[in-house]
Curated annotation (Swiss-Prot):
Keywords: ATP-binding, Coenzyme A biosynthesis, Cytoplasm, Kinase, Nucleotide-binding, Transferase. It comes from the Bacteria. The lineage of its organism: Bacteria, Pseudomonadati, Pseudomonadota, Gammaproteobacteria, Vibrionales. SUPFAM superfamilies: P-loop containing nucleoside triphosphate hydrolases. Catalyzes the phosphorylation of the 3'-hydroxyl group of dephosphocoenzyme A to form coenzyme A. Its main location: cytoplasm. This is Dephospho-CoA kinase. GO terms for biological process: coenzyme A biosynthetic process. It comes from Vibrio vulnificus (strain YJ016). One of its GO terms (cellular component) is cytoplasm.
Length: 202
């Protein structure tokens, strides 16, 4: 299997931008946990069937897709329902990510997982790459991007692993603090490093 680089970072750190640059400039295959999480509850999936069985058919939209807003409301006030959902979906997501990683054709793959640290998914990775920004940058970017207030962003930050926890697990770090920092140069340097490592990994 290809060398697996786990790419993570807090909210608004620039994970998607970094992943896209790896893909656009170096044709690196990406397995994105957010996309996989949507796939395992797509219409016709075992995941969606189990959710409907548990919550009832009104958890679906008219088109037969999962009504995420409805689901969020259901689990928000009921911790046991959230636990049930996580127990169902996390193993499915993990299995699908492993399957997708096995299909990779590039010398190494990026496994993009926002909650890599929180869900202890570093076991799927050969290395962990953290996109790092200061908290004040996360606050400003999220407020600008999502139109939310500081209190809401702080609540999200509190629910995620801390910057310190992420950096403690990092093998490599990309600084994405300002537009002045050359993201592509940092990515190019890491690409060369990962290529060399992937040759040793064969």
């Amino acid at each position: 299997m290809a060398l697996v680089i786990g790419l993570t970072g807090g909210i608004a750190s620039g994970k998607t931008t970094v992943a896209n640059l790896f893909q656009q400039h170096f044709a690196i295959d990406i397995v994105d946990a957010d996309i996989v999480a949507r796939q395992v509850v797509a219409p016709g999936s075992a995941g969606l069937a189990a959710i409907v069985d548990h919550f009832g058919a009104d958890i679906l939209t008219r088109e037969g897709e999962l009504d995420r807003g409805q689901l969020r409301q259901r689990i928000f006030a009921h911790a046991e329902e959230k636990q049930w959902l996580n127990a169902l979906l996390h193993p499915m997501i993990r299995r699908k990510m492993i399957e997708d990683l096995a299909q990779v054709s590039s010398p190494y793959a990026l496994l993009v997982v926002p909650l890599l640290v929180e869900n202890q998914l570093q076991t799927l990775c050969d290395r962990v790459l953290v996109v790092d920004v200061e908290e004040k940058t996360q606050l400003q970017r999220t407020m600008d991007r999502d139109g939310v207030d500081e209190q809401q962003v702080r609540a999200i930050l509190k629910a995620q692993a801390s910057r310190h926890e992420r950096l403690a697990l990092a093998d490599d770090v990309i600084k994405n603090e300002s537009k002045d920092q050359d993201l592509l140069q940092q990515i190019t340097d890491l690409h060369q490093k990962y290529l060399a490592m992937s040759k040793q990994n064969r």
